[in-house]
Design a protein with these regions (language model features):
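Conserved HGGG/HGGXW glycine-rich cap/lid loop of the alpha/beta-hydrolase fold
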Residues: 7-64
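Flexible "cap/lid" loop of the alpha/beta hydrolase fold
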Residues: 100-105, 111-142
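Active-site loop/oxyanion-hole signature of alpha/beta-hydrolase fold enzymes
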Residues: 40, 49-94, 255
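Catalytic active-site module of serine/aspartate enzymes centered on a nucleophile-bearing elbow/loop
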Residues: 232-267
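Short beta-strand/loop motif that positions the catalytic acidic residue
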Residues: 203, 209-211, 215
């Protein structure tokens, strides 16, 4: 199993396929295993790199290291270990935070950026309020109820259960107290850690904002607003999908992502 070294920790990653590189970055309810519906489709034409973000899955670290700067350094360390200088970043939720921060701080490493159901750690009142409400309801709903759309829960119960099982690979699901994990999430989105809204005008790489029509955390109307701030960006709305469109509607999301990369990525 390959690991990359970064800031005193070992980061688990996998590489498969050949072609221009794509780095897949999971959300806070998942890990590298969650991209199983993307890899068979992308790998015939792309080098696909998945990783367990620090504190998730096999990238073991104390929850006190849950920090966006660490995540960016880790992503670059994984690319270096894989021998990749430049990649398209596909980030879901938390992974989108990492993608945006990397695009701003290290534009030479990012060929394109696709933010999937991500509030982007942006200092936007509607997005911050949605995240705060999600923390309040954390104990009242299961991971699949919080992250998947109503249509998917009603029609794909088996895959919804698989989503929950993938999450259970993470220490946050079984060995970290809710209060400690919630504090880590809140700390990562502290006022001094947020990305200013006006920073979006500095994003230089081709950018896609993809969102599920039923996403309770990332409203479509806010994504339309952010699209206006990211020069040349595109918006894709996935019908009847919640906060995990890539998992709920993989065929549609894969088509949108591959088309975007083919047309816009600067590998």
């Amino acid at each position: 199993m390959p690991f990359a070294e970064s800031r005193g920790r070992r980061l688990y990653y996998e590489r498969q396929g050949e072609g221009p590189a794509v780095l897949f970055l999971h959300g806070a309810g998942s890990n590298a295993a969650t991209w199983w519906q993307q890899l068979p489709v992308f790998s015939p034409r792309h080098t696909c790199i998945t990783m367990d973000i620090r504190c998730f899955g096999r990238s073991v670290a104390p929850v006190q290291e849950f920090d966006l700067d660490n995540f960016v350094a880790d992503a670059l360390a994984v690319l270096d270990a894989a021998g990749v200088q430049r990649a398209a970043f596909v980030g879901q939720s938390l992974g989108g935070f990492v993608g945006l921060k990397t695009a701003l701080a290290h534009p030479e490493r990012v060929a394109a950026f696709a933010a999937c159901d991500s509030s982007l750690a942006i200092d936007h009142p509607v997005l911050l309020d949605a995240i705060a409400r999600r923390r309040i309801t954390h104990k009242a709903a299961s991971i699949e109820q919080r992250s998947l759309g109503r249509w998917f829960l009603e029609n794909c119960a088996d895959k919804a259960q698989l989503y929950a099982q993938i999450n259970h690979f993470n220490p946050s699901a079984h060995s970290i107290p809710d209060g400690e994990w919630g504090a880590a999430l809140a700390g990562a989105l502290g006022a001094d850690k947020l990305i200013p809204l006006d920073a979006l005008c500095r994003v230089a790489c081709p950018t896609l904002l993809l969102v599920g029509s039923e996403d309770p955390i990332v409203p479509v109307r806010v994504m339309r607003e952010l699209q206006d701030l990211v020069r040349g960006s595109e918006l894709a709305v996935i019908d009847q999908a919640g906060h995990s469109a890539y998992f709920e509607k993989p065929d549609e999301v894969n088509r949108v992502l591959l088309d975007f990369l083919e047309r816009r990525a600067k590998f």
